[in-house]
Design a protein with these regions (language model features):
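Intracellular juxtamembrane helix-capping segments at the cytosolic ends
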Residues: 1, 5, 208-211
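C-terminal transmembrane helical hairpin of 12-TM major facilitator-type secondary transporters
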Residues: 161-210
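Central cavity-lining transmembrane alpha-helices of secondary-active solute carriers
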Residues: 17-19, 45, 131-148, 173
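Intracellular loop-helix junctions on the cytosolic face of multi-pass helical membrane proteins
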Residues: 2, 6, 23-128, 143-156
Length: 211
C-alpha cells in the first residue's frame, strides 16, 4: 500500500514540477499577471480532467453498503495504544508540513536574495528552485519503492509509523544542511546553489518517508 501510494504521489507532483518552470518564468520575465494567468489556465485544465474522470470512480453506494454492515466493537487496550500513537504522530505531522511549506516562502526568498544562481553567465530564475522538490520525487520514488520492497523481502521494512518518524527526523536534518550556507552569507555574500539543493534533497526523502 505504501509503495502504491508513492507511485500515485509521483503523478500528483507532475503539476508541481511544471508550474514553477512555466508560471515562475512568465512572472519573472514578463510580469506576474502572465504568471498568475498561466496558473489559472492550469487550474481550469485540472478541473476539466477531474470532472471528466469522475465516471471512472466507484459509485458512492459501495461505501454506504459497507458502512451499513459494520458492527461497532469496544476498543481493546492495544487499540487504545495505537490511537494514542496515531495522535502523537499526527501532531508531528502538523509540524512537518508547517515547516515543509517553508519551501514556498522562506526558502523561495532565500533563493532570490541569498543564493548565487549564475550558471555560465546565465542567471537561473529563483522560482525554478520550486521545481527541485517534485523533480527529486520523480527521481527517488522508484529508488525508495525498490528499497522498501527489498526490506520487505527480508522482513525488515519499517511500519508506516516508523516511516513517518524517519521523515520527521530527516525534516530537521534538512534545515541543518543550511547552517553553513547561512554562515557563508555573513557580510553580504551569497551561498552556492548546492546548499539549497542538498537541503531540498534531504527534505524530499523525508517527505517520501512521511507521505
Amino acid at each position: 500500500r505504501d509503495r502504491a501510494f508513492s507511485i500515485f504521489y509521483v503523478g500528483i507532483n507532475l503539476g508541481a514540477f511544471f508550474s514553477p518552470l512555466i508560471c515562475g518564468t512568465l512572472g519573472e520575465k514578463l510580469g506576474w499577471h502572465y504568471g498568475f494567468a498561466a496558473a489559472g489556465v492550469g487550474m481550469i485544465v485540472g478541473l476539466v480532467i477531474y470532472i471528466w474522470g469522475q465516471k471512472h470512480l466507484a459509485p458512492d453506494n459501495i461505501m454506504k453498503e459497507a458502512a451499513g454492515q459494520a458492527k461497532p466493537e469496544p476498543l481493546s487496550p492495544d487499540d487504545v495504544k495505537k490511537i494514542w500513537a496515531l495522535v502523537v504522530l499526527c501532531a508531528f505531522n502538523i509540524v512537518f508540513w508547517a515547516v515543509y511549506e517553508q519551501q514556498g516562502n522562506t526558502m523561495a526568498l532565500w533563493a532570490d536574495a541569498n543564493t548565487d544562481r549564475m550558471i555560465l553567465g546565465w542567471e537561473m530564475p529563483a522560482s525554478w528552485f520550486q521545481a527541485f522538490n517534485p523533480a527529486m520525487i520523480f527521481i527517488f520514488t522508484p529508488a525508495l519503492t525498490w528499497f522498501w520492497a527489498w526490506q520487505e523481502g527480508r522482513g525488515r521494512e519499517p511500519s508506516s509509523m516508523a516511516k513517518m518518524s524517519i521523515g520527521c527526523v530527516l525534516l530537521g536534518a534538512s534545515f541543518l544542511v543550511m547552517l553553513p550556507a547561512v554562515s557563508s552569507c555573513v557580510g553580504g555574500g551569497k551561498a552556492g546553489m548546492g546548499w539549497l539543493t542538498a537541503c531540498t534533497f534531504v527534505l524530499t526523502i523525508g517527505e517520501l518517508y512521511l507521505s
